[in-house]
Regions:
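Pore domain of cation channels
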Residues: 11-14, 22-23, 36-103, 179
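Acidic, Ser/Thr-rich low-complexity segments on the non-lumenal side of membrane proteins
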Residues: 119-152, 162
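C-terminal TM-helix exit segments that contain a strictly Trp-centered aromatic cap at the helix terminus
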Residues: 20-31
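Membrane-proximal helical linkers
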Residues: 95-128, 136
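Cytosolic juxtamembrane amphipathic/interface segments immediately preceding
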Residues: 1-7, 61
Length: 316
């Protein structure tokens, strides 16, 4: 809840700061306000005057008495209207950007698992589509990365907004896209390799720029995300999908590409508390669309039948 609560707290800080600023101006102008009989003007009456003016309450129990006080009051009332209009227009823009971001992240559950991984995306998408269809898929993620960079650089608070499921996040999705693109650049061929380069470029651009905005220097992973045995499995997937011949000489190229983005992903993961998975999924991970909280709550004594090994590994 840090993202939404911090945004609300920011609005409160802005409003309180402006009210106190105009309070000080009224106090410096001599507290020239009309009060009820037997009441003396002072700092607290100026604060009340400033609050009612900023939120345009118009109660009429306190009014400015001098020309300077009237000018300050009019200016504060206009600024209060502008502040409310800014808040009203700001929230829908934030929600629209958040909603567009989450659409593709939700689609990843069926396409790359939850949490997403490069090997699952290759197994589920690349093995079941022709190279042209997979190229279109990468093109969609290129556009998503560009929109992510534009919206999150303009509104950095969106970086703290969580996805609907705790095993999904925009950072994990972006890292998965970079993993797949790096694989195709290192081992791929033809037009698909060119599209992978374009997707990798904008995705890394977004990752690095957001790291700079959030002041998170790159950090190396303490644990290897891609052990040699998993790399061998990925090469086998690429060959099975007819996307590459996977020459082992390209392993160095993949390592160079990984060094271009993994340290930034690690830094953002630590800063935002958003875990990043490995290149291959953890064993016995079930997609979100196959689970239900109601089943776990309503059947305390009845355990669901275990999935067969084929059902665990197959998408549908």
């Amino acid at each position: 809840y840090y993202g939404p609560l911090s945004l609300l707290a920011l609005f409160v800080v802005w409003a309180v700061g402006l009210i106190f600023a105009f309070t000080i101006l009224q106090y410096a102008a001599g507290s020239a306000i009309n009060l009820a009989p037997n009441q003396k003007p002072g700092f607290w009456s100026d604060l009340y005057m400033s609050g009612t003016t900023f939120f345009t309450l118009g109660l009429g129990d306190v009014t400015p008495r001098s020309e300077v006080a009237r000018i300050i009051t009019v200016f504060e009332a206009g600024l209060g209207f502008g502040f409310l209009a800014l808040v009203i227009s700001y929230l829908p823009v934030l929600y629209g950007s958040f909603s567009r971001r989450e659409v593709n992240i939700s689609l990843l559950d069926a396409r790359a698992g939850s949490p997403p991984s490069a090997s699952e995306m290759l197994r589920r998408v690349a093995l079941r589509q022709n190279p042209h269809a997979f190229e279109q898929n990468l093109n969609e993620w290129e556009k998503w990365s560009a929109e992510l960079m534009e919206s999150h650089l303009s509104y950095p608070v969106l970086c703290y907004f969580r996805s609907q499921h705790n095993n999904q996040s925009w950072l994990a999705a972006l890292t998965t896209v970079l993993d797949v693109s790096a694989l195709l650049i290192a081992y791929g061929q033809g037009e698909l390799k060119w599209q992978a380069k374009l997707t990798f470029a904008i995705s890394r651009h977004a990752l690095v720029d957001l790291s700079q905005v959030l002041n998170t220097p790159p950090r190396e992973f303490e644990e290897e995300r891609l052990p040699p045995n998993e790399l061998q499995e990925l090469r086998a997937l690429l060959i099975a999908a007819e996307l590459s011949t996977c020459c082992p000489d390209e392993d160095q190229r993949l390592a160079e590409l990984r060094r271009m983005y993994e340290p930034y992903a690690r830094a953002l993961s630590d800063r935002l508390l958003m875990p990043i998975g490995k290149w291959a999924p953890e064993a016995k991970v079930v997609d979100n669309w196959r689970t239900s909280a109601w089943a776990r709550i309503s059947s305390a004594d009845v355990q669901p039948a275990p999935l067969t090994e084929l059902e665990e590994r197959e998408h549908f």
